[in-house]
């Protein structure tokens, strides 16, 4: 550049600075330190618009123009200082530097990759990540020399291109033509102004901006003066500077190594900003309009966002919700003492290979502006945290993955492949969000404010009976730092495999892009926008989170390492994250309930309703109804009735206010391949593998119930704590018959172990005396038939809810018992099925298909007489019931409800005459089994009933004992009454149970009994009259049972005198018929066959007094084997011990 050009550039820049940066210069002049270096940041776009010639000179000669800018800036500062009338407190500063930023966005000036040789000498903007920082050094850039001959003093500048090396001139530069070549260095007399701060950093290309397989390149950056220590390892920075070359001084026979470096003029740190995402008012207005559209049903809008999250993975609704909450993040807080509480949540995905864990990690890394994706196999502690590297004779710190992901996301795949000493190094990084380094004499602390999303495989096959720490071989301190741990079990399931295969093949054959799916850029913009929200906790959300934390602390099966204050902090972070995801600035009750439901579904929760397999979760058809179910379940269990009533009223007002509520639901049902698209729409009602357990445990909040099945995994079970919604329960079962996964749990690869799978009722345990009553009431029809019936019933129909089981008033209930509300009846109905859930066995596939076909045919048959409910509060029965069960309606219920349908078997028997019909109900069946007709019930205790399995009896003995049949009725009645005369305190507090449920087996066994009645009817005479009298007493009792359902103690004492007799005694003795003064005292006559005292009768009753049944939250899906060896015992011996 010639002198004219230099003068032009200097004048234009001086006038520009005086006009646009006068205030900045005044602030600098007010500073007291005159030797410090002060920057003035100049926007290149504005400068070039003022004068285009400056832009041309700047691009052609950047080093010379920058020196001119600095000189012009000093002149401008001096002019401003002299123009002030009162310059008190202002002083002139000599070390002023013009810092250029804001270059025009064009490929010639802005680079995202490391510059190459052709860029040498150009002023560029380069974006990268700092991976290494050196120590700050003192650089002497000028040195004075004196000629030994003429004593001329001259200045020598250090050569940047040769690592700031000083070279003495070959001859004296004096004008006196001195030819001396000997000089003396005056370094001892050099002032501090001849030195400057110097630092070298190393930047690397951003990994997310590279293509797959590309190795990120790096380059050295030179920082001087005020730019020193302006960044640290792990920072994302944009550097404005001149690309230059440098090499070591030449040596003989040594090749010259030239490297490209960037001499920085200005550094802009991008940590706090969302790099590469343009956030303007138009984008914000688009998202505000989106939530305004879903104002009536915000959960439908949230599910649309979740469906766009990793759309190549089908379903997995729970995992997508958890990942979205983790990406949204919480709020970081710092108290008055300086203690910092992290706002980032950590998520661990544990699952079998091929369950989509790595897909979620890759997608999350793509939509997060600052992210690092690594694997545990190739990462050491230095690769994850920080390492000390010796370069050019000095030690430097090089940042690892966690430091590079500061204020971003760090995805670690194969997390269990880390070595043990490497895992411990990230403890501080996960909780304190910093890394303390003391390596090679370098002691410092680096920030790791990152969200960790890790994935791991279980150690071998996942064993639900063991803890998560044992299954994945990770220590408890490390696991406790994860806010959520989701388990993905790839269990055998034909329906799930069919849906997944059709979804994948559809995308392969006919790839299509759904219009409802958000693009990746839109998802990136949304998550960058919501991370700027600062939601605050509401009082309702505080109450729910606090109450849930207290219940976790009080839980018997709590993990002491997990249920600490970290759990409460995790709940707060996740609640704030969900509020951000819903685009709100307040954490409401909806957020708290959703967070509790997700926490319950993870392995970190389970205090309320247990864990769930997050793999088989689908998007709900009605998200608002699903939330209502969650709200009822959780708030009822947390004992917050006031919040529940207020929330239900709010939901009701919301539904009434929304006129177009059906439209968002219809849109949700059409949700894209990511949730319910293609063939998957036909399977929209499919549920998790634990849906069968959900149906039997949703009402009583059993610890063993699968919480995720009912409130989380879809619309298949909308059962609230106060009973199912009327009319919907039956319809949902009918719609989900084909695509339902209800039967999956029954055909799992492992049998059931009662210790881990038996649901525990919240009511007090039933005494053994109450168990004995079940023997008289529920007679088995044969071991083989009973087991087959139980298997078919468990696999072809869900366990009945409140309205599916008849609960008429019965004598035997304690005094003062009255019909309770639907919730109590529901609890009783469910608890009656507890023994059946213990007896789950393997079933052949053919048998399952047969029962499934029968259930489908029954659903299509409109001529079947419906089952009448006992009270208006009970819902309609599920049409999936077998026809035998529907027709087997108790007689008292028919009298109460005036039903028109009659049993065909009863009509055929009653045609033989009244005495014949009465006797037919108390005879031996064909297979010599102890049976009992449902119509004749004795006094039933409120205790929990247990089914009885008796050994078969050979036909000769049955024929031999057949003649003594009538004489045995009163003795059997006496034995039953004696068993009911146990102390009342043993059965107190136990909810009444529904009648015996195995009616399909009784129906099948009843037909052969008609032929066996005839030879025994001839024994009538006096005994026939006795049976007629007993029947009249029973009918009178039935009419009074609706008014009173109690059995007086005096009657129990009288009837307790009866005892069992051997077959020989029963032939010779004829016991007197029981006399009942009051029909309500004696109860209905119960005459049934008796076995010999010498024979042992086996039962599957669990000994509640010796072993307390508990359900482990880790055994909901992989069912261990049932060993019924300790369950067999001599019932007669037990009766003699407790008369």
From Swiss-Prot:
- Which UniProt key words apply to this protein? ATP-binding, Chromosome, DNA damage, DNA repair, DNA-binding, Helicase, Hydrolase, Nucleotide-binding, Nucleus, Phosphoprotein
Asked whether the keyword rRNA processing is assigned, the reply is no
- The UniProt record gives the binding positions of ATP as 351-358
Can you name a GO cellular component term?
chromosome
> Do the record's keywords include Membrane?
no
Q: Which residues carry this modification: Phosphoserine?
A: 761, 1105
The primary site where this protein sits is: nucleus
From start to end residue, where is composition biased (Low complexity)?
709-724
Q: Where is this region: Disordered?
A: 671-693, 707-742, 776-1022, 1060-1087
BP GO annotations: DNA damage response; double-strand break repair via homologous recombination; female gamete generation; gamete generation
Provide an example Pfam family for this protein. Answer: MCM
State its location(s).
Nucleus; Chromosome
Q: Which GO terms describe its molecular function?
A: ATP binding; ATP hydrolysis activity; helicase activity; single-stranded DNA binding
Q: Which SMART domains match?
A: AAA, MCM
> What's the subunit arrangement here?
Component of the MCM8-MCM9 complex, which forms a hexamer composed of MCM8 and MCM9. Interacts with the DNA mismatch repair (MMR) complex composed at least of MSH2, MSH3, MSH6, PMS1 and MLH1. Interacts with MLH1; the interaction recruits MLH1 to chromatin. Interacts with MSH2; the interaction recruits MCM9 to chromatin. Interacts with MSH6. Interacts with the MRN complex composed of MRE11, RAD50 and NBN/NBS1; the interaction recruits the MRN complex to DNA damage sites. Interacts with RAD51; the interaction recruits RAD51 to DNA damage sites.
Protein family (similarity comment): Belongs to the MCM family.
Role according to the record: Component of the MCM8-MCM9 complex, a complex involved in the repair of double-stranded DNA breaks (DBSs) and DNA interstrand cross-links (ICLs) by homologous recombination (HR). Required for DNA resection by the MRE11-RAD50-NBN/NBS1 (MRN) complex by recruiting the MRN complex to the repair site and by promoting the complex nuclease activity. Probably by regulating the localization of the MRN complex, indirectly regulates the recruitment of downstream effector RAD51 to DNA damage sites including DBSs and ICLs.
Q: What is this protein called?
A: DNA helicase MCM9
Q: Which gene name belongs to this protein?
A: MCM9
């Amino acid at each position: 550049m010639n002198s004219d050009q230099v003068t032009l550039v200097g004048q234009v820049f001086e006038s520009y600075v005086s006009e646009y940066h006068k205030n900045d210069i005044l602030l600098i002049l007010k500073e007291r330190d005159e030797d410090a270096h002060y920057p003035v940041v100049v926007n290149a776009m504005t400068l070039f618009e003022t004068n285009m010639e400056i832009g041309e000179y700047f691009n052609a000669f950047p080093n010379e123009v920058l020196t001119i800018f600095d000189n012009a800036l000093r002149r401008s500062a001096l002019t401003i200082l002299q123009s002030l009338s009162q310059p008190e407190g202002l002083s002139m500063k000599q070390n002023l530097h013009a810092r250029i930023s804001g270059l025009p966005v064009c490929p010639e000036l802005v680079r995202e990759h490391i510059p190459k040789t052709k860029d040498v000498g150009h002023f560029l903007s380069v974006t990268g990540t700092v991976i290494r920082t050196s120590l700050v050094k003192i650089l002497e850039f000028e040195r004075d020399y004196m000629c030994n001959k003429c004593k001329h003093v001259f200045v020598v500048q250090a050569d940047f291109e040769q690592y700031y090396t000083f070279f003495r001139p070959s001859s004296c530069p004096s004008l006196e033509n001195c030819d001396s070549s000997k000089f003396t260095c005056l370094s001892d007399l050099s002032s501090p102004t001849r030195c400057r701060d110097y630092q070298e950093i190393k930047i690397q290309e951003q990994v997310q901006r590279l293509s797959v397989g590309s190795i990120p390149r790096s380059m050295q950056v030179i920082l001087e003066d005020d730019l020193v220590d302006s960044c640290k390892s792990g920072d994302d920075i944009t550097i404005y500077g001149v690309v230059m070359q440098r090499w070591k001084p030449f040596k003989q026979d040594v090749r010259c190594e030239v490297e490209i470096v960037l001499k920085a003029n200005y550094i802009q740190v991008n940590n706090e900003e969302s790099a590469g995402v343009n956030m303007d008012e138009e984008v914000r207005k688009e998202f505000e309009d989106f939530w305004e559209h879903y104002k009536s049903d915000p959960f439908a809008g949230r599910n649309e966002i979740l469906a766009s999250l990793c759309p190549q993975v089908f379903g997995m609704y729970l995992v997508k919700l958890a990942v979205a909450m983790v990406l949204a993040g919480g709020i970081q807080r710092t108290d008055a003492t300086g203690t910092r509480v992290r706002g980032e949540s950590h998520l661990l995905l544990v699952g079998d290979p091929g369950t989509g864990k790595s897909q979620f990690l890759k997608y999350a890394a793509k939509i997060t502006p600052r992210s690092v994706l690594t694997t545990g196999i190739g990462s050491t502690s230095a690769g994850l945290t920080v390492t000390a590297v010796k370069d050019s004779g000095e030690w430097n710190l090089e940042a690892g993955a966690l430091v590079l992901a500061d204020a971003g996301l760090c995805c670690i795949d194969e997390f269990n492949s880390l070595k043990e000493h490497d895992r411990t190094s990230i403890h501080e990084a996960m909780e304190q969000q910093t890394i303390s380094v003391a390596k090679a004499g370098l002691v410092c602390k680096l920030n790791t404010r990152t969200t960790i999303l890790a994935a791991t495989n279980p150690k071998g096959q996942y064993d639900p009976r063991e803890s998560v720490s044992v299954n994945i071989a990770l220590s408890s301190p490390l696991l406790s730092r994860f806010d959520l741990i989701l388990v993905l079990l790839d269990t055998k399931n034909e329906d799930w495999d069919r849906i997944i295969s059709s979804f994948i093949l559809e995308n392969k054959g006919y790839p299509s892009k759904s219009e409802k799916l958000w693009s990746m850029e839109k998802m990136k913009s949304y998550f960058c926008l919501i991370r700027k929200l600062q939601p605050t906790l509401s009082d309702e959300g505080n109450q729910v989170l606090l109450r849930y934390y207290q219940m976790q602390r009080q839980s018997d099966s709590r993990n002491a390492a997990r249920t600490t204050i970290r759990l409460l902090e995790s709940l707060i972070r996740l609640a704030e994250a969900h509020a951000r995801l819903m685009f709100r600035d307040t954490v409401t009750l909806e957020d708290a309930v959703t967070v509790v439901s997700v926490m319950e579904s993870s392995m970190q929760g389970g205090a309320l309703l247990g864990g769930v397999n997050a793999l088989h979760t689908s998007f709900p058809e009605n998200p608002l109804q699903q939330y209502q179910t969650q709200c009822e379940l959780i708030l009822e269990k947390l004992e917050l009735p006031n919040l529940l009533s207020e929330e239900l009223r709010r939901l009701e007002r919301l539904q009434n206010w929304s006129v177009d509520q059906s439209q968002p639901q219809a849109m949700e049902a059409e949700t894209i391949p990511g949730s319910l698209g293609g063939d998957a729409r036909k399977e929209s009602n499919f549920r998790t593998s634990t849906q069968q357990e959900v149906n039997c445990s949703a009402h009583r909040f059993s610890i063993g119930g699968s919480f995720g099945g009912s409130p989380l995994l879809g619309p298949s079970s909308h059962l609230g704590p106060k009973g199912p919604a009327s009319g919907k329960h039956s319809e949902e079962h009918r719609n989900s018959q084909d695509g339902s996964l209800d039967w999956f749990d029954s055909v799992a690869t492992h049998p059931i172990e009662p210790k881990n799978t038996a649901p525990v009722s919240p009511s007090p345990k039933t005494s053994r005396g109450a168990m004995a009553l079940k023997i008289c009431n529920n007679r088995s029809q044969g071991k083989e038939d009973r087991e087959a019936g139980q298997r078919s019933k468990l696999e072809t129909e869900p366990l009945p809810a409140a309205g599916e089981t008849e609960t008429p008033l019965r004598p035997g209930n304690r005094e003062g018992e009255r019909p309770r509300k639907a919730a109590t009846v529901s609890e009783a109905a469910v608890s009656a099925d507890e023994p059946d859930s213990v007896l789950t066995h393997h079933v052949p596939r053919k048998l399952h298909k047969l029962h499934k076909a029968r259930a489908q045919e029954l659903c299509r048959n409109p001529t079947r007489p419906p089952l009448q409910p006992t009270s208006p509060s009970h819902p309609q029965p599920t049409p999936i019931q077998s026809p035998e069960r529907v027709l087997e309606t108790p007689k008292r219920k028919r009298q109460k409800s005036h039903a028109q349908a009659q049993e065909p078997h009863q009509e055929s028997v009653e045609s033989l005459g009244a005495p014949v019909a009465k006797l037919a109900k108390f005879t031996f069946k064909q297979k010599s089994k102890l049976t009992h007709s449902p119509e004749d019930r004795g006094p039933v205790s409120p205790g929990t009933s247990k089914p009885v399995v008796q050994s078969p009896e050979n036909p000769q003995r049955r024929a031999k004992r057949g003649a003594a049949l009538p004489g045995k009725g009163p003795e059997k009645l006496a034995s039953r009454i004696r068993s009911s005369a146990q102390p009342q305190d043993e059965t107190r507090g136990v909810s009444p149970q529904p009648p015996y449920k195995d009616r399909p087996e009784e129906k099948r066994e009843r037909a052969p009994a008609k032929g066996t009645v005839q030879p025994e009817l001839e024994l009538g005479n006096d005994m026939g009259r006795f049976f007629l009298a007993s029947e009249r007493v029973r009918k009178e009792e039935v009419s009074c049972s609706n008014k009173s359902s109690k059995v007086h103690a005096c009657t129990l004492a009288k009837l307790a005198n009866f005892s069992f007799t051997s077959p020989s005694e029963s032939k010779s003795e004829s016991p007197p018929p029981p006399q009942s003064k009051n029909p309500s005292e004696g109860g209905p006559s119960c005459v049934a066959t008796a076995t010999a005292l010498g024979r042992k009768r086996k039962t599957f009753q669990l000994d509640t007094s010796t072993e307390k049944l508990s359900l482990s939250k880790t055994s909901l899906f992989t069912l261990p084997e049932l060993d019924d060896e300790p369950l067999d015992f001599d019932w007669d011996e037990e009766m003699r011990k407790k008369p």
